[in-house]
């Protein structure tokens, strides 16, 4: 795996391998590399979990983390992302984890030797989040085949939803969507069925909630926090209708008492904190796969 840009670029075999490696890291597996390796985390949008867990993953792997601050970089002088990455490549950085507000920001960057991990591109995709979600689901159920999964909330503006709906259908899950119809695109019906939230909660094995992404909305939101929670959120009453072994997921950050009742965030059914923990292990697996391939290519070039 040279880069990780989207879930669609991964084969089912590659996905299964990453999930297995993440499980091994969670059980205490150690990674070693032939040479000193370097990573840079380039975040042009705010991030807590993705940024922090990638850095923890890098350090657990023994990878040196190169500091980067977009506001104090030469990009403020007009340097392009390509030329910034060319510089990182020239000084010996192996992999760049990038979050950017622009969808498909990575187009044209693949020809660089430095590896690129997409940490989220606008409303496009978020492959490492999708993989940690898959890891969390597989830990719970052991399979994706036949599972009923709901994706509920601000679907149109969610890169997590974009990644997850495509890969979950590919892996054999049955998908349901819910949330404000104006935040739903009819093209999503190729992946699943749209239903009101009150019909969904009784059906599903996984209730995956999404944050209302106010920063990506062009106008004034027509819902108050209270009205959104009442109409579309996972309230305490709705949660009582979930199947006994159903789990609740959320990519975070969570808006408590908006998409999910405050009391449910750390409830018995919730896997929200587990997702955060699993994020470190899946990102270790991603980085190891990329860095091991770099080592293999370098070895072939010496013959």
Curated annotation (Swiss-Prot):
Positions with a binding annotation for carbamoyl phosphate: 49-50, 99, 126, 129, 252-253
Keyword Transferase annotated: yes
Stored SUPFAM superfamilies: Aspartate/ornithine carbamoyltransferase
Protein's pathway: Pyrimidine metabolism; UMP biosynthesis via de novo pathway; (S)-dihydroorotate from bicarbonate: step 2/3
Single GO term (MF): amino acid binding
BP GO annotations: 'de novo' pyrimidine nucleobase biosynthetic process; 'de novo' UMP biosynthetic process; amino acid metabolic process
One family name in Pfam for this protein: OTCace
Taxonomy, superkingdom: Bacteria
Disulfide bond positions: none
Keywords assigned: Pyrimidine biosynthesis, Transferase
Similarity field: Belongs to the aspartate/ornithine carbamoyltransferase superfamily. ATCase family.
PANTHER family from the UniProt entry: ASPARTATE CARBAMOYLTRANSFERASE (PTHR45753:SF6), ORNITHINE CARBAMOYLTRANSFERASE, MITOCHONDRIAL (PTHR45753)
Subunit annotation: Heterododecamer (2C3:3R2) of six catalytic PyrB chains organized as two trimers (C3), and six regulatory PyrI chains organized as three dimers (R2).
Function recorded in the entry: Catalyzes the condensation of carbamoyl phosphate and aspartate to form carbamoyl aspartate and inorganic phosphate, the committed step in the de novo pyrimidine nucleotide biosynthesis pathway.
Name of this protein: Aspartate carbamoyltransferase catalytic subunit
Native source species: Listeria monocytogenes serovar 1/2a (strain ATCC BAA-679 / EGD-e)
Protein encoded by which gene: pyrB
